[in-house]
Amino acid sequence: MSFQPTPEDKFTFGLWTVGWQGRDPFGDATRPALDPVETVQRLAELGAYGVTFHDDDLIPFGSSDTERESHIKRFRQALDATGMTVPMATTNLFTHPVFKDGGFTANDRDVRRYALRKTIRNIDLAAELGAKTYVAWGGREGAESGGAKDVRDALDRMKEAFDLLGEYVTAQGYDLRFAIEPKPNEPRGDILLPTVGHALAFIERLERPELYGVNPEVGHEQMAGLNFPHGIAQALWAGKLFHIDLNGQSGIKYDQDLRFGAGDLRAAFWLVDLLESAGYEGPRHFDFKPPRTEDFDGVWASAEGCMRNYLILKERAAAFRADPEVQEALRAARLDQLAQPTAADGLEALLADRTAFEDFDVEAAAARAAWPFERLDQLAMDHLLGARG
């Protein structure tokens, strides 16, 4: 298998990823700004499929209408020249001080209305550029103190905002769905919808739940100490994995945004195994930050590494699944039984079945052959580490 990416792999990057200048809470920028047109050109040369953006990544905040059209025109020309696509777009409702208390859930009603209009304007551009997914990350939706926000009212306002956006895209006839991106801990101390589970539960309360899914990010779930592949499995099970952000994270700490494959390599292996075996057809979107120690050569090397690592893990996962010894271990672990309904014969038959309880020999069941999970896991490790042919 070749580890050289092609557009068929559907690898995408945000303008804000390779374009991150290295500025953080403790230090100024270490790289100059990167022209979005150059980003499109360089990513195309590396074999990427598409590029994504916040409105303010492409069009500097406060631009006039004339300036806005000029930025869009240059960007569109770069897309046309390279064949790159825009599968997803999103709105920046977190950088400008006006959003210091949030966008959709700010206590200030005027700010909430502005946030909706800002989002709607970029939805129009996203649809114009062919995007099929619109991501919503509520980075400022939350609080640092208990009395600052009535969470029930805030969730009402969040619901109101998404219902209005759903109404808008439906009225416009846009072929566009929303993907809510959960994240805990930062930049607000307590953010609303911090995990995949929170977002999935929230979606079921919306007026058009079919329009809404999730955009989980590797590091975000791991910041909460959760198993990312398990979260993705639940999103797939719910039919709500509309988009995914791939990066690396080393445990429960700040959002590191390492290149994909760095950090928790085992979780990355199981994630790729799941996405490929489940037939996920969406973009493999990298939301990472090249370390501030890197120059632009390092930026592009980091982007290339994201794609290469995914392809290596894809090859290793496929070899793992095709290995006869692995298949035997899977049968011994009785995963085929887990896929069988527990009571396909129905409740009445279950209650009438004495072997299910009254005559069930718990000692005999406990004494059955052990579950060879360690053997199965070591086989996975062998494949991951390249110790099997």
Swiss-Prot record:
Keyword Protein biosynthesis among record annotations: no
Residues noted as binding Mg(2+) 1 in the record, renumbered to the chain: 181, 217, 245, 287
Pfam families listed in its UniProt record: AP_endonuc_2
Family to which the UniProt record says this protein belongs: Belongs to the xylose isomerase family.
Location in or out of the cell: Cytoplasm
Cofactor(s) the record lists: Mg(2+)
Gene that encodes the chain: xylA
Keywords: Carbohydrate metabolism, Cytoplasm, Isomerase, Magnesium, Metal-binding, Xylose metabolism
Catalysed reactions, as listed in the record: alpha-D-xylose = alpha-D-xylulofuranose
A GO cellular component entry from the record: cytoplasm
Assembly and oligomerization: Homotetramer.
Residues annotated as binding Mg(2+) 2: 217, 220, 255, 257
Active-site residues per Swiss-Prot or TrEMBL entry: 54, 57
SUPFAM superfamilies: Xylose isomerase-like
Comment on bound cofactor: Binds 2 magnesium ions per subunit.
Protein name: Xylose isomerase
